[in-house]
């Protein structure tokens, strides 16, 4: 109530950190009026039949995570998010060591693009928008400028202009990308 009273324009998002992998859990979360958006686990990104059956009011609340790099078969996602959250808050707790294939390599956009849950531009345009979905989330704000640039080029720049934009940015000595 404090937030509603003092910050009336603030909206709440049910985060991907809840790891909503069960579609029924997603539907229950979408029915909660306090959330403007609900981010399902990336493994539900391709549940097209069930997603398409949602009423438009719920479709408007779904915010898809497009470029998740986490292994599709991961069973430790919740523990990972909890450890990261504790660390960000400066709280004590057990460290999480990811045991997924390729985890030691860190985030790789190429690996994210090969993930079955990946949503690229073509899928947004040809599949999700026609089904009534309009909210998409790009992961990685803390991954570094060069990687964020690649996300922005992929999602916001026509392919024929990507190299030109990349060169202009990389060759601009005023920018500190690396």
Which residues are covered by each model-predicted region?
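Active-site pocket-lining/capping segments in soluble small-molecule metabolic enzymes
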Residues: 1-25, 29, 35-178
């Amino acid at each position: 109530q404090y937030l509603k009273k003092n910050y009336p324009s603030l909206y709440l998002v049910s985060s991907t950190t809840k790891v909503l992998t069960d579609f029924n859990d997603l539907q229950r979360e979408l029915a909660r009026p306090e959330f403007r958006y609900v981010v399902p686990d990336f493994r539900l990104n391709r549940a097209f039949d069930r997603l398409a059956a949602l009423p438009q009011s719920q479709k408007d609340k779904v915010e898809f995570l497009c470029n998740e790099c986490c292994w599709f078969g991961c069973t430790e996602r919740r523990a990972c998010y909890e450890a990261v959250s504790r660390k960000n808050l400066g709280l004590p707790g057990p460290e999480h060591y990811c045991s997924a294939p390729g985890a030691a390599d860190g985030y790789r956009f190429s690996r994210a693009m090969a993930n079955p849950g990946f949503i690229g531009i073509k899928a947004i345009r040809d599949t999700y928008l026609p089904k009534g979905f309009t909210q998409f989330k790009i992961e990685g704000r803390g991954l570094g400028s060069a990687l964020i640039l690649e996300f922005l080029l992929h999602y916001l720049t026509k392919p024929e202009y990507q190299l030109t934009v990349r060169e202009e940015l990389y060759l601009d000595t005023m920018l500190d990308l690396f």
